[in-house]
Amino acid sequence: MNNIKDIWDAVLPPLPKPPLMTGTAQTMLSWPKVINSIDEIPDAFRTFFKTWLGDTQEFPHVILSPIKKGFFNTSSDKLICEMNDTIYVVEQFRDRIIANGYSPENIRDVEVGVVLLHGWITIKGINKEGVPAVSMFLFNSAQSEMFSSFITKIRSAPTKPDEAALNTERAKLDYLSQLDFKFMNYARSSLMGGEQVMHSVWQPEIHTTVGSVFGLSLTRTLSPAHLLLLTDKEMILIQDEPRSRGNKGVRYGGIRHYIPLRSVGAVSLAEQANDLIALSIHLSEDERVDSLFAASKEKEVLQLKTEIEKLIKE
């Protein structure tokens, strides 16, 4: 025996090594999961939930969104819950629990993004305390269907839509198949039962040339490909995520931004550099959603602006 380690190994048997966790198992730890009872609530939230639920007999619909490193940032453990017609997002901030509750009618807008396995939902509105609030949670998009009931609730969509009527409205978007098949599918699947398509404008990705190297032009993306879809109930903005990579000119995934018409205060149109025009959806005095279009789309965009103004005045 040449050293202390040899002596130690001879006296004591080696400790058993823990089983290695496969990459798949590690990935599954980041998946959201349905919580069925108070005993399944993570320790950090359990006392809060016991007090919060009180004598409630029926356990609410709760989903745990675990800590996840997202496409652009990292999210801590969060619980998403529906109770008494209210959507709650509960999270731990330092040593306290924060719960933002949103009634559907007080939600200003909601964004749903999916890029490969990275998914996120951002809710903006007035919480139950009457304070402006923003809640965001990340999730593995392989389990994105878990959150569909929350989006349905937020958008006040019927759980059992008239399929014949819905297919009639979806057919109005079939023209997109000749422009961008991915966006057609996104648009058709974004429609909810009971709403009517009023107008839509499609804009391919907009680039500008910033220089050249060895005779090859260098370009910069000014605006991702996007579609503005107006229904009689909401504005739906569907767009590529410009920071995502693509394959054969098609970027992976996309973002859907749902804005109920009650949240739209005004709409404006302005000329921009590079022969572009900007359509602005004003949600409040200091916040708006801007969409860039080529000047060649001006007639379509003007028609869209007129349709929006008519609907928000009704």
Which stretches of residues belong to each language-model region?
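N-terminal beta-strand/beta-hairpin edge segment
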Residues: 85, 91-93
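Intrinsic disorder/low-complexity detector
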Residues: 1-74, 84, 112-227, 232-233, ...
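Short, glycine/acidic-rich beta->alpha junctions
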Residues: 102-104, 220
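Extended, Lys/Arg-enriched charged tracts that mediate electrostatic binding to polyanionic substrates
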Residues: 90, 105
